């Protein structure tokens, strides 16, 4: 039997989201029950954001922690990323909840093993959970502040403040409209029983109904950025290969476009040469997704030795855990090292920017279709969409890819994602398997998103 300490996973945590909608009435009864005395408005605001986030965190997983700074330096109440103006006053509220036995508190410390400071972890106590269990979450909409920032600008890796421009304002409006669509859309794996996925590096991912999509950019490289923020953006190759044919949008037939088919075209464009990568791998070790990501890892590596050692060490992330080092080395030699056109890229210690291009293509697609409210999702370098909107998605994407990758005379072809049975029912093709084939977790999420 493991000790209580062994069972706690402090890495399974997320920071408090200061951009929640504290005007929500979801937890008002809970707060009234726990705090009978009237407090000042400053206290009430900080109490509400903390209880609200503890509630959302518990809904996501009762094993998940919230990280919170117990230092005044951890707060900037004037930040554009803090529309509720949450200050270090939150520390006082945290201490009060600890005193009243409403949260479990694990103080932050300096980790000598990783040489990093770890923030304090908190989690709802049984007393607080008893109150949460009385709450019925009405929907996943309107949980965020109306001025929530979806464009995140960084300066040398640190989130920074910035003055608005026409470009940033345009990006923000597109992201706001897209996130309204995301908040109303169920994107899920119907037969998955638990809402926790485990990556190849053992990091846990929660299939959260409260996802928000961000566009992260470096302020000095504003033309480049990465789409992220949601559970599906955190999936590694190991997980993706297991669920790519099961991802489903709104309980309907779902398809996807695989952008890795144009990875060689991208390499050709940036190298001004003709790079070819065999899409149908005859390797008993590597499929095409694995091959492309190993190629990119080879580009980022400094030497062939460090590349091979890193691949073998991280082989589970690439879904290669069942193969020996010699088998992996042979596959790499046959399908990467033997490709002469790749030699100009290998072992340069550089990222060639493929993920930036994928995010740019996706963002341009989003900007084209938000007005017609078609839900689309970027999962690694695959774009998922409802099958019944395939023609409009392909039309838009062909124009975007033509412009971004300088491709001529090509035709996009979508692949079917969901491996569940469907039949045509009215205008939409909906899942018709018996509910017994779907997890209770998924059926509950259907109700939450109004898909009964």
Language model features with spans:
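Acidic, glycine-rich two-metal-ion catalytic cores of nucleic acid-processing enzymes
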Residues: 121-290, 380-382
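C-terminal polymerase-core module
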Residues: 302-307, 390-452
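Short, hydrophobic-biased segments on the C-terminal half of alpha helices
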Residues: 91-95, 366
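Amphipathic alpha-helical/coiled-coil segments positioned at domain termini
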Residues: 377-388
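Conserved catalytic core of nucleic-acid polymerases
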Residues: 1-44, 54-57, 111, 283-376
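A short, conserved structural fragment
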Residues: 94-112, 375-376
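Short helix->loop/beta-hairpin flanking segments within DNA-binding domains
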Residues: 31-81
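Helical catalytic core of nucleic-acid polymerases
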Residues: 67-86, 231-347
């Amino acid at each position: 039997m493991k000790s209580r300490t062994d069972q706690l996973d402090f890495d399974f945590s997320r920071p408090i989201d200061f951009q929640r909608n504290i005007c929500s009435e979801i937890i008002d009864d809970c707060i009234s029950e726990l705090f009978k005395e009237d407090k000042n408005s400053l206290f009430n605001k900080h109490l509400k954001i903390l209880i609200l986030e503890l509630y959302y965190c518990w809904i996501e997983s009762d094993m998940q922690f919230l990280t919170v700074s117990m230092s005044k330096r951890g707060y900037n109440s004037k930040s554009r990323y803090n529309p509720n103006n949450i200050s270090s006053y939150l520390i006082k509220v945290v201490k009060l909840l600890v005193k009243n036995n409403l949260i479990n508190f694990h103080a932050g410390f300096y980790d000598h093993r990783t040489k990093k400071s770890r923030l304090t972890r908190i989690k709802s106590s049984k007393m607080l959970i008893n109150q949460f269990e009385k709450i019925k979450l009405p929907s996943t909409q309107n949980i965020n502040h109306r001025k929530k920032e979806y464009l995140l600008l960084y300066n040398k890796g640190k989130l920074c403040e910035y003055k608005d421009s026409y470009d940033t304002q345009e990006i923000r409006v597109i992201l706001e409209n897209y996130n309204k669509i995301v908040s109303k859309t169920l994107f899920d794996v119907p037969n998955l029983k638990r809402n926790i996925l485990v990556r190849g590096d053992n990091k846990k991912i929660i299939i959260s109904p409260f996802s928000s999509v961000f566009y992260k950019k470096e302020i000095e490289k504003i033309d480049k950025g990465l789409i992220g923020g949601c559970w599906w953006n955190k999936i590694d190759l190991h997980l993706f290969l297991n669920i790519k044919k099961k991802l489903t949008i709104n309980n309907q037939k779902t398809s996807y476009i695989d952008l890795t088919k144009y990875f060689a075209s991208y390499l050709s464009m940036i190298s001004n040469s003709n790079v070819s990568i065999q899409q149908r791998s005859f390797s008993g070790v590597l499929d095409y997704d694995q091959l492309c990501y190993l190629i990119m890892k080879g580009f980022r590596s400094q030497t062939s030795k460090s590349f091979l050692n890193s691949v073998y060490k991280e082989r589970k992330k690439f879904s290669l855990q069942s193969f020996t080092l010699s088998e992996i080395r042979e596959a790499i030699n046959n399908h990467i090292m033997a490709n002469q056109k790749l030699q100009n890229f290998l072992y340069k210690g550089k990222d060639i920017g493929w993920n930036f291009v994928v995010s740019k293509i996706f963002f341009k697609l989003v900007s084209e279709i938000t007005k017609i409210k078609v839900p689309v999702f970027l999962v690694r370098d695959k774009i998922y969409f409802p099958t019944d909107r395939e023609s409009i998605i392909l039309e838009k994407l062909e124009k975007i890819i033509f412009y971004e990758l300088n491709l001529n005379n090509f035709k996009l072809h979508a692949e079917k994602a969901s491996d569940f049975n469907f039949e045509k029912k009215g205008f939409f093709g909906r899942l018709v398997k018996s509910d017994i084939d779907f997890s209770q977790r998924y059926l509950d999420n259907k109700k939450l998103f109004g898909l009964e």
